[in-house]
């Protein structure tokens, strides 16, 4: 997706992380690699395998209203991989399949909850004579995320949780672009809804590539990484007590904010190893607590990287979860 040369307000990736990942702390591996502190916000355009079905619509035909995909057994949340001989990765691929359509059923390959299925879909002509499917699809994602750490070669880890759909299923990412970004505002949380950072891409030129989407974060590589612009950081294990997060909530420069690590749990197979509470009055004044878009913010304790912010409590924006850094390293 091309980033247009204008201020573009971006939706922040949802802080939904339901996937499982095993844990085992290994300081020996961490000590052999030089890590650099993140805390900066990057913009992502992510290409996913297939096209996700996000809704249906009726097609007005000479014989009344029709909804071919819905009638063929396709469900919201399904991912379309193929239509006949056409591989589907974008809305344009769907259009191409319809342009080549002659008659009869199209055998459509979909993924539903991780299971591959074949369904038969019969396109219909609308009043203009064009074939339609009566479906809304999403073929790529755009958003902001906070980097947790970099390595010397420019590779980075961010978010601390997967990029998932509304059903909590991890997107199958096949690539994407990375852009510099700036934060231009915040929406503070309410008692029933999490707040979020608001930002925009800076420039049209990509500064890196997305490489993978995992249960413990979104990974990529910066093309021209300048290590002198980032602080070296050692790796350690979190324990209850005072700590800080390193996060960007205004502009492009990250700052340290005080938090308390309330609880640690290294036996849970999730992204919720740490319970944290914001204790920094300045941050609470600016944001009202942890916001969507802050996920991935490094958690620093005694000068060492111990984890990353992953979730916010909906009923208490000052509290949230963090992931142990070792999970992201592995």
Regions found by a protein language model. Name each.
Residues 11-22:
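Bacterial N-terminal signal peptides
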Residues 124-288, 292, 301-302, 310, ...:
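Serine endopeptidase catalytic core focused on the charge-relay Asp
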Residues 40-76:
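PDZ/PDZ-like groove recognition
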Residues 2-12:
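Bacterial N-terminal signal peptides that target proteins for export
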